[in-house]
Amino acid sequence: MDAMDLTVAKFKEFTQLQSSAILLTVVSGIIVIVILLLRSKRRSSLKLPPGKLGLPLIGESLSFLWALRSNTLEQFVDKRVKKYGNVFKTSLLGQPTVVLCGAAGNRLILSNQEKLLSRTVSDRVAKLTGDTSISVIAGDSHRIIRAAVAGFLGPAGLKIHIGEMSAHIRNHINQVWKGKDEVNVLSLARELVFAISASLFLNINDREEQHQLHKTLETILPGYFSVPINFPGFAFRKALEGNSKRRKHFSVLQEKRRRDLSVGLASRTQDLLSVLLAYEDDKGNPLTDEEVLDNISALIDGSYESTSSQMAMLLKLLSDHPECYEKVVQEQLEIASHKKEGEEITWKDVKAMRYTWQVMQETLRMFAPVFGPRGKAITDIHYDGYTIPKGWQLSWATYSTHQNDTYFNEPDKFMPSRFDEEGGRLAPYTFVPFGGGRRKCPGWEFAKTEILLFVHHFVKTFSAYTPIDPHESIWGRPLPPVPANGFPIKLISRS
């Protein structure tokens, strides 16, 4: 075959391949169009919730993002509730979404999270918490991890470690808060919450080591709310790098602890790391190294903002309601009066902080996160006369019950006593600051105890405090709401 014939043959072969490629593209395009038409036809035959999906891909994302930026998300939801009712559809960040409001919506989500919904976190979050963290996994895996962490975060573990937690908080207030005329509550609360996690989860008590890990955490957290672009200079890349650095640090601690446990140099209950390394499920299987690392990291990240923000918001609300603060002072000083010098708070003492717990509940009612995705439908969901198609995202709005006068009298008013008068009569699924069902926040009792102990030692140490700006605004919804400037205050120590 001469060169000309070879060229012609190759040309014919190329033409045939090109024709095949074009044909394949056309056929694929037709198949996609048919699938889209069938889906469209199917959706048109379903009774979807009312609402608007907005522009293709964009949906109502611009309005939603503006509401986030301007702290008007409640108005974004309220406008649609008034127009469409407690169930409406929208499209957010390229995802068709159904928003459920009210107690019935809360019930559907919280009682069916594993039967009807996929995991509640995005791939972006999973890359930071790890694929085996309690916030990502479901089914038996979730049950096993939940049982493992409950041994430390629940009442049994708290009764063992409450004295240690109390001492950490007392020392932190004496060393970092006391002696200063002015402090930023949110900033120091974050420092305190991280120090407690570092000590009680990993037995890290060296101040410099805590400081370096705290700095690393501050590079990780923005990644949870950033665009997931893994490219130099972007927040998500910095978060991934920070997470990798932290995991290496934790891995070294884990290997040393495993050796110490094997030769009796460490206790099986001394901290969360030991508890997880020593845990075996009902079949005698231990947790993997990945499961231990993922869940310690996830619990540190999850508790950091939520707990510190509540400390700041609680003090801010009490500064606006001195009559409530005086009741807290009386309760805490009464408990302190029965303690000997140097004697720490006990589990029994915490259970006696009834009014302070009411204040905390009222703070959570008024300033819980407003809005959040709860997962994607893994099957068609029939609810309130509508069909929520498989693959659509479901979101809820906690404030739709927390701020609803159907469930709470005068919901705009700060009235901690409502949880004394109404606590036993609250309608189910109306007060849900920690979620509910099988995926209720696993650390809610740990956080509750931490905040109550903080209030106790704050009241014991300071006779009064005054906000620098009494009219400081609230920022951060739908994330944990916080005072816009961190709530700077002037402190007056007790003599």
UniProtKB/Swiss-Prot annotation:
The chain crosses the membrane at residues 17-37. Its EC number is 1.14.14.-. Heme binds at C441. Pathway: Alkaloid biosynthesis; taxol biosynthesis. The keyword NADP does not apply. Pfam families: p450. Keywords: Endoplasmic reticulum, Heme, Iron, Membrane, Metal-binding, Microsome, Monooxygenase, Oxidoreductase, Taxol biosynthesis, Transmembrane, Transmembrane helix. It is found in: Microsome membrane. The keyword rRNA-binding does not apply. One of its GO terms (molecular function) is oxidoreductase activity, acting on paired donors, with incorporation or reduction of molecular oxygen, reduced flavin or flavoprotein as one donor, and incorporation of one atom of oxygen. InterPro entries: Cyt_P450 (IPR001128), Cyt_P450_CS (IPR017972), Cyt_P450_E_grp-I (IPR002401), Cyt_P450_sf (IPR036396). It is a single-pass membrane protein. It comes from the Eukaryota. Belongs to the cytochrome P450 family. Catalyzes the conversion of taxusin to 2-alpha-hydroxytaxusin in taxol biosynthesis. Catalyzes the conversion of 7-beta-hydroxytaxusin to 2-alpha-7-beta-hydroxytaxusin in taxol biosynthesis. PANTHER family: CYTOCHROME P450 26 (PTHR24286), P450, PUTATIVE (EUROFUNG)-RELATED (PTHR24286:SF384). This is Taxoid 2-alpha-hydroxylase. It comes from Taxus canadensis (Canadian yew).
